[in-house]
UniProtKB/Swiss-Prot annotation:
Processing after translation: Cleaved by CASP8 and other caspases.
Transmembrane segments: 7-27, 44-64, 103-123
Membrane topology reported for the UniProt record: Multi-pass membrane protein
Name used for this protein in its record: B-cell receptor-associated protein 31
Protein's UniProt keywords contain S-adenosyl-L-methionine: no
Superkingdom of origin: Eukaryota
Quaternary organization: Homodimer and heterodimer with BCAP29. Binds CASP8 (isoform 9) as a complex containing BCAP31, BCAP29, BCL2 and/or BCL2L1. Forms a complex (via C-terminus) with TOMM40 which mediates the translocation of components of the mitochondrial membrane respiratory chain NADH dehydrogenase (Complex I) from the cytosol to the mitochondria; within the complex BCAP31 interacts directly with unprocessed and processed NDUFS4 and NDUFB11. Interacts with VDAC1. Interacts with VAMP3, VAMP1 and membrane IgD immunoglobulins. Interacts with HACD2.
Sites annotated Cleavage: D164, G165, D238, G239
Coiled-coil ranges from the UniProt annotation: 165-237
A GO biological-process term: apoptotic process
Subcellular location: Endoplasmic reticulum membrane; Endoplasmic reticulum-Golgi intermediate compartment membrane
Motif Di-lysine motif, residue numbers: 243-246
Amino acid sequence: MSLQWTAVATFLYAEVFVVLLLCIPFISPKRWQKIFKSRLVELVVSYGNTFFVVLIVILVLLVIDAVREIRKYDDVTEKVNLQNNPGAMEHFHMKLFRAQRNLYIAGFSLLLSFLLRRLVTLISQQATLLASNEAFKKQAESASEAAKKYMEENDQLKKGAAVDGGKLDVGNAEVKLEEENRSLKADLQKLKDELASTKQKLEKAENQVLAMRKQSEGLTKEYDRLLEEHAKLQAAVDGPTDKKEE
């Protein structure tokens, strides 16, 4: 394997490792969000868009080169005179196998680049939704406690007005308290609606993350299968070559 394809294969192994690491269930999205917001990661992300575009361009060029090589060595029987070159068939099959291997490596690297970027985005969105969900819960609880407090004060004022024989202007106080209660109830209902909307968004984000995890696991299994086929084909190609050398 040449130097460039060794680098691409190493990059593919690193992508598979990072995807599996992001799919670990016991690491919460909040912890990943803290890691993503660290200084080192932010420094990398500041140059990440340029690096991502350059990486995509390189991988696309490598995919095109691999496709060109496959088409070059595809019709072996039409291009090789087997009578004059008995060993040329094996040579062309080896070239075709390497071109197909390079296409798989470059294609999976390109696909996992988009998958990894999308997975990081979904994890960040899920962490943000979880944080906003907790904030809305706390805000709703504080509003509910304030409403209960005003209702208790209202009851106390009513009792005090009854004891004083109706001398106090209870009517105005009741109107103000009722207005405050209505305002608090409206705020509480608004917070409940926002909390329900946030829960729906959170469930949607969790479903997307789960789908991405299943897709990444499927890609990993497919890549393992291709590695096994690669090993079998390499053994099949190396076997006749070793016999000829002997």
